[in-house]
UniProtKB/Swiss-Prot annotation:
The keyword Disulfide bond applies. The lineage of its organism: Eukaryota, Metazoa, Ecdysozoa, Nematoda, Chromadorea. Keywords: Allosteric enzyme, ATP-binding, Deoxyribonucleotide synthesis, Disulfide bond, Nucleotide-binding, Oxidoreductase. The active site is at residues 433, 435, 437. The record marks 224, 450 as: Important for hydrogen atom transfer. This is Ribonucleoside-diphosphate reductase large subunit.
Length: 788
């Protein structure tokens, strides 16, 4: 019998081999190419790996340990995250087939392990195209690009995005991107490879449902679905519930308005009984959201429920997420949202009375907006059809106190959403979506749908610190064409969704990495230069998307309900805001083209949260500033340490990055504002969201809003929330004309989770111990459905 020393590894083929420190070190060194070796130490990683070994460890487990070890050293230098990812990617590459077409064949030929039935994981159509074009597609893939992901990004891909057989990943990231591209473009191989390259080089990404499902047997690639309750009856309520379940099963996020459901105590004509109102019904929806988890626990189901503040059950509705109170009055898995008419805000401002009504007794309030709504509401008040009269500020205080406790409800403005919508010719828009960036018309026979993608703005900053608007416009046009194609090839879980999407053809372009873009340009987030760039970026995207949509209309005709829309009358989004665009784009020529050909898509712009896809690409989310410069983040795939890589690079170049500096940063909860020795220009550039005026954030949202024909997921951050402060922010946003006043209210925890391993008293001396983790505000993971 062969003897082994006390520690051996088990190779992939089952052979046993003695552990060799030099071999481990050599492998880590090979994967450290191009990294800053003044700060990345392969030997230090290898020493830690050796100390964690046990007898019989497999080489796969050894690689996982090495990757996690490198990831744990990210707070020393951000390039450890790249090294960690390279080790993990190398491990995956060893386990998977490098030939794209062969991997797709394996996925197509998959048989159910228990029944033996053919259960293909990619569609017959997708496989036929790949088989026919195998050589061209195989040679187009650049596997080295897998090594450009950060560890955090790669682990996110592993957890939810790469296809698995019997729980084993068989797909590489580059193969996933090519599958997605073929699923969108079919046999248009040139366009598929173009899309693959743009995603692979991280200029843009399609939304999570598209990455999950493109090319599969059920290619449900849409992110957002907006529903109106079909009718106020048992049949209507449960029909709508079934629709929500089918959509959620297919990875769609849901926005549902319940304005028309009668209030508590209303008479039920058929049985001569009385209604239990909204709350018991919403608890049923809550349980459905918990039960339907989008297949294999990829993501929990998520429903946002919208209600107008005149509804007689409004006080109970707003309290649904409270941590205390009777369980039968709570629905903590629903996301609550208010659809607020201007009249309510005016009455709060003037400290006037507010009347609560039942939609059964006061019909039509949800079917109109603006002056028509105000006239009907006043008519019902005059006729005495009111259930209850309260001070408007009493309800407002109730809303704000719940926001302080739970971060909800979302605030969306009904009149701004309708007044500035290109879909206003369809009827009254009654709600937004799960993440408050989609503003689309829905009806009992129409479920609004939106397909999303986001542009990684950091990629458009040149080495000379110039912003490449030409490339931005070029990529925007590709995305617009892609999203338009998805409308046609998409699988629709319910027919009402197909009906709506085919008629109106809305799409949603968003961004990620705006904060990274500003940092690369050396612009503090709210500086004059950043504000100007913010406007020009969104003007460019809107212009390019309109131009691409017009070119599609020239080929295929405008969308079915184009006539009568504001754009058909020459009214573009910035016209509705009363804003004059810059001279950067040739708007006069584009207006003439649109007047002649129309546009193919009713809506184009919708900056979404990008929670998951920004993690994959290593960017800060969406339009948000950084929340901290150093923190741990808990997501589905585990706990990861995140360091602001731009700041680290600056501190390293100036010789300021030391263990002591790292621990000062942790002790200051990710802020550098009070750390001595850091130059003022660095402090200004790396202000966290807690150190930026929220008034400035709202102003920048309004600036870009003139070019956003849907809306934007706008969070409000307040370290110490107060009634006065939140009220001030809401009224400022409303008066600025925002459609979405607030997505979440983000607050700091009462006690900051500073790691106990950091001894504040020892900060003046050299630190001896490695700090294993970092600090951050505690927040939910964010919406993954809308992650564009």
């Amino acid at each position: 019998m062969q003897r082994y020393n006390s520690t051996y590894v088990v190779k992939r083929d089952g052979r046993k081999e003695d552990v060799h420190f030099d071999k481990i070190t050599s492998r880590i060194q090979k994967l450290s190419y191009g990294l800053n070796m003044d700060f990345v130490d392969p030997v230090a990683v290898a020493i830690k790996v050796i100390s964690g070994l046990y007898k019989g460890v497999t080489t796969v487990e050894l690689d996982n340990l090495a990757a996690e070890t490198a990831a744990s050293m990210t707070t020393q230098h951000p390039e450890y995250a790249l090294l960690a990812a390279r080790i993990a990617v190398s491990n995956l590459h060893k386990k998977t087939n490098k030939v794209f077409s062969e991997v797709m064949k394996t996925l197509h030929e998959f048989h159910h392990p228990h029944t033996g039935k053919h259960a293909p994981m990619i569609s017959d159509e997708t496989w036929a195209i790949i088989e026919k074009n195998a050589d061209k597609l195989n040679s187009a893939i650049v596997y080295d690009r897998d090594y450009s992901y950060t560890y955090f990004g790669f682990k996110t891909l592993e957890r939810s995005y790469l296809l698995k057989i019997n729980k084993e990943i068989v797909e590489r990231p580059q193969q996933m991107l090519m599958r997605v591209s073929i699923g969108i473009h079919g046999d248009d191989i040139t366009s598929a490879i173009e899309t693959y390259n743009l995603m692979s080089e991280r200029y843009m990404t399609h939304a999570s449902p598209t990455l999950f499902n493109s090319g599969t047997c059920r290619p449900q690639m849409s992110s957002c679905f907006l529903l109106t309750m079909s009718e106020d009856s048992i049949l209507g309520i449960y029909d709508t519930l079934k629709q929500c379940a089918l959509i959620s099963k297919s990875a769609g996020g849901i926005g549902l308005n319940v304005h028309k459901i009668r209030a508590t105590g209303s008479v039920i004509a058929g049985t001569n009984g009385t209604s239990n109102g909204l709350i018991p019904m919403l608890r049923v929806y809550n349980n459905t959201a918990r039960y339907v988890d989008q297949g294999g626990n990829k993501r929990p189901g998520a429903f946002a429920i919208y209600l107008e503040p005149w509804h007689a059950d409004i006080f109970e509705f707003v309290s649904l997420r409270k941590n205390t109170g009777p369980e039968e009055e709570r629905a903590r898995d629903l996301f609550l949202a208010l659809w607020i008419p201007d009249l309510f805000m005016k009455r709060v401002e003037k400290d006037q009375e507010w009347s609560l009504m039942c939609p059964c007794e006061c019909p039509g309030l949800d079917d109109c907006w603006g002056e028509e709504f105000e006239a009907l509401y006043a008519k019902y008040e005059a006729e005495g059809r009111v259930r209850k009269t309260v001070k408007a500020r009493k309800l407002w205080e109730h809303i704000v106190s719940n926001q302080i406790e739970t971060g909800l409800p979302y605030i969306t403005y009904k009149d701004a959403a309708n007044r500035k919508s290109n879909q206003q010719n369809l009827g009254t828009i009654k709600c937004s979506n799960l993440c408050t960036e989609i503003i689309e018309y829905s009806a009992p026979d129409e479920i609004a749908v939106c397909n999303l993608a986001s542009i990684a703005l950091n990629r458009y900053v040149t080495p000379e610190k110039k912003f490449d608007f030409v490339k931005l416009a070029e990529v925007t046009k590709v995305i617009t064409r892609n999203l338009n194609k998805i409308i046609d090839v998409n699988y629709y879980p319910v027919e009402e969704a197909r009906n709506s999407n085919m008629r109106h053809r809305p799409i949603g372009l968003g961004v990620q990495g705006l904060a990274d873009c500003f940092m690369l340009m050396r612009y503090p987030f709210t500086s004059a230069e950043a504000r100007d760039l913010n406007k020009r970026i969104f003007e460019t995207i809107y212009y390019a998307a309109l131009e691409a949509s017009c070119e599609l209309a020239e080929l295929n005709g405008p969308y079915s309900t184009y006539e009568g829309s504001p754009v058909s009358k020459g009214q573009l989004q910035f016209d509705m805001w009363g804003v004059t665009p810059t001279d950067q784009c040739d708007w006069a020529t584009l207006r003439k083209k649109i007047a002649k050909h129309g546009i193919r898509n009713s809506l184009l712009m919708a900056p979404m949260p990008t929670a998951s896809t920004a993690q994959i690409l290593g960017n800060n989310e969406s339009i948000e500033p950084y929340t901290s410069n150093i923190y741990s983040r808990r997501v589905l795939s585990g706990d990861f340490q995140i360091v602001n890589p731009h700041m680290l690079k600056d501190l390293v170049e100036r010789g300021l990055w030391t263990d002591e500096m790292k621990n000062r940063l942790i002790a200051n909860n990710g802020s550098i504002q009070n750390i001595d020795g850091i130059p003022s220009d660095i402090k200004e550039l790396y202000r966290t969201v807690w150190e930026i005026s929220q008034k400035d954030i709202i102003e920048m949202a309004a600036d870009r809003g003139a070019y956003i024909d849907q809306s934007q997921s706008l969070n409000i951050h307040m370290a110490k929330p107060s009634y006065a402060g939140i009220t001030s922010m809401h009224f400022y946003g409303w008066k600025k004309g925002l459609k979405t006043g607030m997505y979440y209210l983000r607050t700091k925890p009462a006690v900051n989770a500073v790691q106990f391993t950091v001894d504040k008293n020892a900060l003046k001396t050299n630190q001896q111990a490695e700090t294993p983790a970092t600090v951050a505000e505690s927040q939910d993971e964010g919406c993954l459905m809308c992650s564009g």
